[in-house]
Amino acid sequence: LSSYGDAAKKLDILKDPHCGAFAVIRLCSYFAAYFALCGCVAFTPRVGVLWTLALVGERALSGLAVAAFPLAKNTGLAHTFATAADRVRVRQVLAALCAMLAVGLTALGGWALVLAAGCVFARYYVVAKKQFGGVTGDLAGWFLQKCEIWMLAALAACQWLGVL
């Protein structure tokens, strides 16, 4: 994302198996933030159910994106999954699953998790389309990590504010 190159250059960077120093720094920062947020959350049975639904929901959103968003390239795992499936039917099923999970999360008091996931999903679409020309498997993984940490932050904030 930090490259000023065009979409083709950014896709080439994604293919590179080497890891740069700034990637390692960001990875360590991510782990520290995730660990800190996990330490802030009191995992009660209710929170355990919320978190389980949230993890299922983020993966359903990831699948929905592969089925609904444009693809950045004609190769790779995301392309394989998208072209091997009936995209319309997959979109319908995953959209229904996402809606049911959102209702379940909201009913348990996890509206902030739904809001966080929705915001990250919208950002995912904008970044994937604008910077890469569509979705790739690497971007799907990026979305999962972003979505998970933002939902964990929302969960921690709700507990801290006494909402949960």
Please give the residue ranges for each predicted region.
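Multi-pass membrane catalytic core of lipid/isoprenoid biosynthesis enzymes
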Residues: L1-R46, L50-W51, R89-G104, L144-M151, ...
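Hydrophobic core of alpha-helical transmembrane segments in multi-pass integral membrane proteins
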Residues: R89-L108, L113-Y125
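Transmembrane alpha-helical segments that form the membrane-embedded catalytic/substrate-channel core
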Residues: T52-A68, G118-A128
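Divalent metal-coordination and catalytic microenvironments
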Residues: L14, R59, D138
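Solvent-exposed interhelical
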Residues: A60-L94, Q131-V135
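Active-site His/Glu-centered metal-binding helix of metallohydrolases
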Residues: L1, L61, A140
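Membrane-interface segments at loop-to-transmembrane junctions
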Residues: K15, A78-A85, G141-K146
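Interfacial loop-to-transmembrane junctions
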Residues: V126-W150
